[in-house]
Amino acid sequence: MLVDFWASWCGPCKGEIPNLIELQNKFGGEKFTVLGVNVWDEEEKFKAALTEEGITYPQIYIPRDNKDNATELYGIQGIPQIILFGPDGVIIQRDLRGQAMKDLVEEKMK
């Protein structure tokens, strides 16, 4: 599973969306999925961004005032933060972006 912590106002986050869509389209299924986790955002802007960016992979919206925020659980200080998890739930790598992210997913899906 590739988990992307993002927000609608984050330019670098939006820059990774085409890569995430590409990976979901290529590998999405029983053994792999992209999961977006929208943080530090407003719900209306999050929903609008899904349409504007053409995001079809699963999403979780975490309200700004959520006290049990996943960003704290995973020690996320900035976004985008893209983390690849193995089938056992263990983090394989964090801070993934661009071609390096695509190459790593491709390698792990062989």
Predicted feature descriptions by range:
Residues 8-12, 25, 37-41, 61-62, ...:
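Short, contiguous acidic/charged loop-to-helix segments that flank catalytic cores in large enzymes
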Residues 5-6, 32, 49, 57, ...:
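Conserved hydrophobic/aromatic "anchor" residues
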Residues 15, 51-56, 62-108:
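Thiol/disulfide oxidoreductase modules built on the thioredoxin-like
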